[in-house]
């Protein structure tokens, strides 16, 4: 099963990912934790370029191509092999961040972003995306693979809800969906 976490910085993604991984391991699952950009040696090198304050003049098209290169390596080297081995992969961010940051944030054409992302991932989408810290109204606009979690509660309450959602999806997962960002 491939699970991704999205949400603004400071929404508790890292904490919730760690707690979910601990719980899944206690349930007997093999879990791989990863992040984007990064997740592989090549991806981490690209992450360094993307996050270098010296590169503030980076063109938006250059940025999306670098993120996509990192993602392509991530999928090929880590995510697909882990899925094939029956592991649960939990990623701190994935392709949905591309629409938010490069699409809405940097003004790139959403259809172009979808096409580039589909090429980079070979169409691989998560079975479940957990999005922290959005309103219920925004959450209703998502697809059925999204689980909107109210992150304004205690860490324990948020984790309990995440566990409930993941438990319900285990065994019902759809690993390879058409790309609908």
Regions from the PLM with identified roles:
Residues 32, 65, 128, 147-149:
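Structural signal for short hydrophobic segments within the conserved structured cores
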Residues 29-121, 161:
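ATP-dependent small-molecule kinase phosphotransfer cores
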Residues 16:
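Hydrophobic positions on the alpha1 helix immediately C-terminal to the Walker A/P-loop
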Residues 10:
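Walker A (P-loop) phosphate-binding loop of P-loop NTPases
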Residues 19-21, 137-181:
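NTP-dependent small-molecule kinase module
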Residues 13:
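Conserved lysine of the Walker
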Residues 3-5:
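Hydrophobic anchor at the beta1->P-loop junction of P-loop NTPases
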Residues 91-93, 114, 122-139:
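Conserved phosphate-donor/acceptor-positioning beta-strand/loop module used by diverse small-molecule
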